[in-house]
């Protein structure tokens, strides 16, 4: 009987530790502003859940370069311009299409994470981590129009 009690305590302790709050990118980082958005970013979670597709985005000098492997086997590149007005991020593709929504959020104070919260009826929170976009993705990407394949943004 004593063994069963010890086993029950061990299982309870394991469950308490295993169910504790996770650290890392799935939790929403402290959000600053978009002042430090000019960087390269990799999507790590959507509404706190790790994604099973690949999206990279680079922001530089008012331009964005979106590399995604979402609806295809290959990475697809979308390019365009972005603006930040009143703490809201918007983008337009070079072929004239607009992002599906605008975003609020910002870069974490330590510069490691970018949080984008969609301005939709049911907002979605996207967490990106600062990174360097792999050269093989940049060099082998297919360029496309925003109307040919559904872009992530």
Predicted features by range, described:
Residues 10-13:
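Short, linear, compositionally biased motifs with a strong N-terminal bias
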Residues 20-78, 88-153:
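Lipid interaction determinants
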Residues 82:
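Short beta-strand-centered aromatic/proline hotspots
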Residues 15-18:
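C-terminal motif of bacterial Sec signal peptides marking the signal peptidase cleavage site
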Residues 1-6, 20-21:
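Positively charged n-region of N-terminal signal peptides that target proteins for export
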């Amino acid at each position: 009987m004593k063994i069963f009690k010890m086993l029950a305590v061990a299982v309870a302790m394991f469950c308490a530790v295993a169910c504790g709050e996770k650290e890392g990118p799935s939790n929403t980082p402290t959000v600053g502003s978009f002042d430090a958005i000019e960087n390269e970013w990799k999507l790590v979670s959507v509404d706190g859940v790790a994604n099973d597709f690949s999206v990279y985005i680079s922001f530089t000098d008012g331009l964005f370069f979106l590399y995604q492997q979402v609806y295809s086997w290959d990475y697809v590149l979308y390019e365009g311009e972005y603006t930040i007005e009143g703490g809201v991020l918007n983008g337009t593709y070079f072929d004239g299409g607009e992002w599906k929504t605008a975003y609020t959020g910002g870069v974490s104070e330590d510069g490691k994470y970018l949080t984008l919260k969609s301005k939709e009826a049911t907002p979605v929170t996207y967490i990106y981590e600062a990174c360097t976009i792999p050269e093989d993705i940049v060099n082998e990407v297919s360029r496309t129009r925003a109307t040919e394949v559904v872009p992530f943004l």
